[in-house]
């Protein structure tokens, strides 16, 4: 994009006059003329780039500063457009005071007002004025507030309508209405305004109260805020973009849900109507039972008002005695939950997908249909819910990233242009300098219209801003203390940082603390560092980014007070003005000439021009500085004067002492400990504290407050306020201390819990020393910053929908509230009658709970409105906007966010303090050791030579890593071998070696090495160690790592390795010879010891192999050292016999059969645990059998353990984690067995121990590869997960303590317990606790607490977990909202704004922290992939493209098509069946079949059933016919296609189901024939195969297919966890009372029932219901003395066990496993999308081979050259080369074999190359491919290519030339002979020379053709390009093409094909 030179003139801005309009008309006419001319030359037109509008001159943007100052008289006036793009458009621009660009049409507005009309100009001036938009914004906000009120008069509405009308009129007058560009209706935002106004008038004109719908549209006014606030439009753009992207996912979702809904319809229709009815009723009346009309004949489910559902199957729910299960007329939940018709089934499935109270539907369905249908729910939840919902997340994330990328690109484009402009200015300046004009002196020139601010002020600003002690302060004794300890890290600051994506318009992220080392200006450029830094021009000091404008610091006096002194008048050094060498692509010559044109000879003009250049540059710099400046210069100087305290030497001395004290690492440690202790004190508050305890807490609070105040005061004195307040942490401290002091002052007058909660923020001070917390807060900070606009959008959405709900449904809720409110309440909890409650409902929908409110809404209002409103909020708000939130959060995670602390180069003080303590500990230990060793000397073992594998690092970058992680001594040379005892000596002597600076792994420079020098590192490694030995060395290293953890002080010593290498290794002294072929000198800088002789290593390696037949040592070296008797000589008797025994055991243990046997036993013993349920005592035989098998298993496992001890030795056995697990579990079995024999088995701990045997399967699974991968991934993620868990706990601690402050003791209430039902005693009877005691005459009143409450911090955590998972949160919220004071009876919504506490917690505690789990797990996945990822990391993007294309190519080969039958009739059918039209017809029929299945309902008439039955028979007949036809035509080949087999099975099943339903009507109750019909639905999958167009959907399914293996592994692991937990649940909670979520079907009494419960809470659904009965501890909730059937007593739970059981299960399954599931899906979705965007996909190769089959029916893999042109044209997609294509094909230089045939692989390679373009990487990949192809096609014989197409063409042309020459020779000769005077014209033509192109070609070639020997010699498999074309392609120029083109295409067709 050209930079308009004119725009740099000083008179940039010209008024828009009639002349300007005439000029535009001329330009347009000229453009029209050129357009016509251009149409004649079509080809040129394509190549020209169309002009595009300039990015920084878009409407609504601010005009960049370098266009100059805008004169005051031109503000708001029409100006000529600066953007050259609009020079041919009838437009002009207007700038307001803030330099915002507005564009207007220069045509007449409303056909009346020209741009020069006074009225229109006034309107324009008003419309662009900033106050106008401000006024409108304020109006909108006021209007929004008014709309939330119900009590305001109607007239106010008219006022707003008038204001909006006025706004619209002004805009229409200024812009015109709609015909031309930039008119009013051309802006989509104005459509909104216009419709709002129109509807307002319609509503007023037709005064119908009924049209509340029209009044609702007023609400859309709130959306106008979007159009007024600029940043919001971008986010709305992203939203719309993501909604567009969701099209594919939406189709897939609807498709999947429809299929599932159909299955649900077939399986469950009518079932949910089954209820338990009193037995004495007459059966014939049952048809019209309705639970509304006759509630007394039903029995209700305990604790609810819902009738009890039941089923007639054996495994469904049963009725209690006296009741019978009958089908009634209505469904549960106001008749809205059912599968009775397709629509209701679809709604139920959508609810399952969004997982909203799905456990309720799950329980209802299983109760009525049977437990076996859990399978249906497993499929729907895992495939439907997890997969589809997360696909939405994946798509939204991707759309966001694309949008982000686009914005970044735009910014970069702007930046590039800006740099070009500056480059131009710089060149102008050079020219001026050459012409002798002093640019610096021009600063004082008054003539410059642009110099807005005086130079001195600017000079002030150009001084390096004092960020923390600026450059000049170094000289003064007061240099900033913070930076002294940073000085040593200057290297870090200036070294290579990770390239943050810098750009001009980046804003500093809110949480980022930019503090620079001393002597570094804010630009990151060191004084005197004048290298040219390529970087972002406008961004001065981004985070650690080097700015491109190196400024030399100005000479400054050391005293800041005299800053206004002599330097005031110095001209700034030129380096300020000349931006340093900015790296810009050079301008084209044309533009350079402009600078040196004759203008410069004109003296006055030159001066002015120079001035303008200078002032523009300075204004650019000003712009740059303003963006960086923190505060105005006058304030800076004032603050430096008054906030830096240096009054007298005593004071300075005090400062120095305090400085030492405050910066000491131990001070930081003390403060951190104080914060921790203070937090613990705050967390100890609880309900019912004793006065002494309370007093202790109070005193503690005072002490801590004093302590923190002292810390603050000391710091202020030590650092001076000026520097103290430049650190954000210090400001934070200061605020908290001030609030704490305030609270202490106010505490006497009454408790201010608001201020008390401020103290909680102290916890965040931990972030200073805890990097993860810091990072997390930053992530939240960053995303809140990025989310600022999104949050506003979300707020607007919530606001708009809340208002819509209030307007549309408010009245309905008021009038019909009795339908849905509880009997004793006036209002329901959730309603839309007022704005606040309406807002809460919308917020609740955003949390994912919509269905219950929707039922209530449908009960009171119009069903359609409710459905539309709730589903819209759900889809828009929850699925799109909330996922965009998550996308932003995930985006904030960068690779090492959580593992690496901030790399600001600052040593963490805490680490230093801890390191000092460590050193002290080591020294003490050493002193003690030396003291004792003097008194009793130890025998020192002989030092062994070390085996150190050389590090492959030559680069100096490695030094950092080496110094940090391996203590090698500072010399870097060889290290003396030393004994094992000395390993700490160098550390103690020189503690700086590895303790002082623990560099986190993320910061080590090795990462950089991986990034930029991956290949170097590899190649170096290969240089040093020959390839073969490398692997062996790695294996040795791995072995060493595996067996002994290496200490930092040693390499892998031979002693460490000895046990694994057998005895012999130790006895030899191994010579240290450098590796073969490597010189001594090549020893790398950081290595300790050169490599051992590889021969030696190779000799030892076999002994390391897995099938090593020799066992290890029994004992570790430590044992042998301390107890030499353990060292046995196995060569002497009697030990040699023992050795043989060990070898035998070893062989047994290592045998695969032994392993299989043990795994089988493990599975059996695990299975036996499943039988030990609640009813075991009623089955004596089973019990006896289990006891017996238990003993057998125990003995087997003990025997296995003993065998392994003997075989492996203790050392190996006890260093293996899996063996430890075994050991513990065997011990548990032993203990429980012993206890059984001693008759202690009923002791509770022993029973609990026995359940731990369920952990055994873990070991079996360690043998399964897939499972192990998941476990490894999990183990790898554990540190990060624990970190996040800890941070969550800290975050939640604040809310928990706050909850305790707000609600402790306020949840108690008086309840009435009658007939097993609980009810709250009305406030009129009981007011407080004492009333409850007094009124309790009947003994049925109880003063109880809500089970989950905020009485202490631990309970608070449980309550918060329920709120965060949205399970059970309602009861907690209701209790909080109803609470009054301690010991008072609650009152309905007495404390209504407590809802906000929960809203805030859900946003910060729930939303952010729980989604961090997804972030962390995904992050970890990516990191582990990086560690494991092989070639990917070292491949460029280009290489990857080729690699992927080739990968796909390799798996394919040509197949023989099914031969057409010879029989005439069969052939006819074959032609029909193989047509695409036939397939499409079948697809249409499948869809029709699906539709007829949708039509079915539960209560359909007999007639309808019959018709549907007939239709079904018709479809079965059609599909059978299709099947028969295909079998007839395709014969035995029919079964070679998977789809055909599938069809065949479906048809057989369909026929079977028809026969069954016809013969056995009686079987229907057991065996629904419709189930078979469900199978037919699977045929719909065929549609996806056919539609190549449905690429997006196929990508999504492809992602699913890719995810399946991983998901299966995760599922297995999840099953394992469920198994273990269900065994545990069976032993812990079998007898709990049935209430809430536990009943006769869902309980922990049998294994199956436990699994039902655990599957449900895998998604966290309904875990509160299962936990509730377990929290019962005594009356009235349960009876501890109730006898149970198995001999135990009581039906109470054990709260502690229950809470641990459920919280751990929720964390493992819901937070970790399910998030792994999400991570896999997101990952594979990205991969699949990348694959689908690649230029060549699998389909293209499939298509190639499909087309190939037609041209090569015998699958010979060759086609003739003559057929190639047609073949290339027949292909579709990117590989196709349309006709005329002969020239292109010839130039492809394809190898020919005898018979002019070409091999398919050659063609495919050439076509692939044609699509992907030339690339050097093809060669290696091609060779690779050929090998692969040969492997898959063994039939292929080698063949010799004898020529290539290009060679053939050349020979052909040569032949023609020779022929022509010969003909002319013959002609001349005959002429000479006959001596005829005149030559006939035709012969003259024939004799003429060949055309120009060919002559050029032959001259160029010198007519040299390659040797035959050179091409034909290579025999290849199949031929490679090189073998055939080596001699040619290097020499042949593209001139061939001209010769070929010049030849007539027609003649070339007739040419004779070449002979061999």
UniProtKB/Swiss-Prot annotation:
List residues in the membrane that do not cross it. 342-366, 835-855, 1354-1375, 1647-1669
Query: Where would I find glycosylation on this chain?
Result: 284, 288, 312, 335, 819, 1312, 1328, 1336, 1686
What residues bear Phosphoserine in this entry? 441, 444, 467, 479, 612, 615, 1451
> Which superkingdom, per the lineage?
Eukaryota
Gene3D superfamilies from the UniProt entry? 1.10.287.70, EF-hand (1.10.238.10), iswi atpase (1.20.5.1190), Voltage-gated potassium channels. Chain C (1.20.120.350)
UniProt-annotated stretches for the region Disordered: 27-54, 443-485, 500-580, 963-986, 1041-1089, 1909-1956
| Repeat (II) residue spans along the chain | 647-911
**At which residues are the I repeats?**
116-405
Q: What does this protein do?
A: Tetrodotoxin-resistant channel that mediates the voltage-dependent sodium ion permeability of excitable membranes. Assuming opened or closed conformations in response to the voltage difference across the membrane, the protein forms a sodium-selective channel through which sodium ions may pass in accordance with their electrochemical gradient. Plays a role in neuropathic pain mechanisms.
Q: How does it assemble?
A: The channel consists of an ion conducting pore forming alpha-subunit regulated by one or more associated auxiliary subunits SCN1B, SCN2B and SCN3B; electrophysiological properties may vary depending on the type of the associated beta subunits. Found in a number of complexes with PRX, DYNLT1 and PDZD2. Interacts with proteins such as FSTL1, PRX, DYNLT1, PDZD2, S100A10 and many others. Interacts with NEDD4 and NEDD4L.
Q: What's the protein name? A: Sodium channel protein type 10 subunit alpha
The species is Homo sapiens
